[in-house]
């Protein structure tokens, strides 16, 4: 009996704990980003700068954990040559920073509903990138499945009227990076010798590039030295501590989400991530269901098409 239960778990539920964690923390982080960055809410003036702080905290956390406890894979990271480190960190960090940074900028201008609708195109870009890198072969049945998934997710948020062109362009670019992100990270990690066996070791390798790229984007695009003029975020010592606390709260959520995501990337495939990503977006939409009845978080109304999708 125990053997059959274990076999069933290994065949059908192996990724369930990490998938569940990914769904939960990703939805929570989307809500955090919308509330902190959205023009209708706190309207934090430098989303990229705050995101770079999240990456810096991830780097520090993963470094301390892997250096303190060797079971987390710190020895593997320390034994990497600089060439091997950069060959993994730079391309993976670039696509990850592009996905996350552009998504956060899009959320400044668009609703969670519209964001989810555009992000429904991500499975298509996963298939394209997986084919380009020869990880998977595109078949007719696979294309049909991907199109059905994308169409079904689109139906869940059809009816959005708050269209914003810049937000749309940012979000579609984020979807392209997202499709490349899972494929490139999986490709780099699976071909690395010796492999990075833990999510913390992987975070330690990827987060430095993500931090520096996001910081550069912030300095060029947002110009933080002038963006905070006239705001209350750093006008007093108390407000400065509150702002840093806000950043640390987001970083904590991001660490939990990325650890789950990296574990799935290491142990599964890009297409399992694709399916999980669709469910993740549905969880994000579901968190906002019933603006007047259940939750007020994202100001969404879950349409009838949600049920058509399932």
Identify what each model region corresponds to.
Residues 1-310:
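Polytopic endomembrane small-metabolite transporters, centered on the Drug/Metabolite Transporter
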């Amino acid at each position: 009996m125990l053997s059959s239960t274990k076999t069933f778990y290994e065949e059908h539920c192996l990724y369930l704990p990490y998938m569940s964690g990914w769904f939960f923390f990703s939805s929570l982080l989307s809500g955090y980003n919308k509330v902190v960055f959205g023009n209708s809410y706190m309207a934090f003036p430098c989303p990229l700068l705050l995101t770079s702080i999240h990456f810096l905290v991830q780097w520090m956390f993963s470094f301390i954990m892997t250096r303190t406890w060797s079971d987390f894979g710190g020895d593997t990271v320390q034994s990497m040559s600089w060439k091997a480190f950069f060959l993994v960190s730079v391309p993976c960090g670039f696509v990850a920073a592009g996905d996350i940074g552009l998504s956060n900028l899009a959320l400044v201008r668009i609703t969670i509903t519209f964001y989810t609708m555009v992000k429904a195109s991500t499975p298509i870009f996963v298939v394209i990138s997986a084919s380009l890198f020869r990880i998977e072969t595109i078949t007719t049945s696979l294309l049909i499945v991907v199109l059905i998934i994308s169409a079904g997710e689109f139906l869940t948020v059809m009816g959005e009227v708050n269209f914003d062109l810049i937000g749309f362009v940012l979000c579609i670019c984020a979807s392209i990076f997202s499709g490349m992100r899972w494929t490139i990270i999986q490709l780099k990690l699976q071909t690395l010798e010796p492999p990075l066996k833990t999510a913390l070791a992987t975070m330690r390798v990827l987060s430095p590039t993500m931090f520096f790229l996001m910081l550069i984007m912030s300095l060029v695009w947002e110009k933080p030295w002038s963006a905070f003029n006239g705001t209350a975020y750093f006008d007093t010592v108390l407000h400065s501590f509150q702002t840093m606390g806000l950043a640390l709260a987001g970083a904590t959520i991001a660490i939990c989400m990325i650890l789950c995501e990296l574990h799935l990337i290491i142990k599964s495939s890009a297409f399992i991530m694709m399916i999980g990503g669709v469910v993740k977006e549905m969880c994000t939409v579901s968190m906002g269901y019933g603006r007047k009845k259940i939750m007020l978080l994202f100001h969404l109304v879950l349409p009838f098409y949600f049920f058509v999708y399932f």
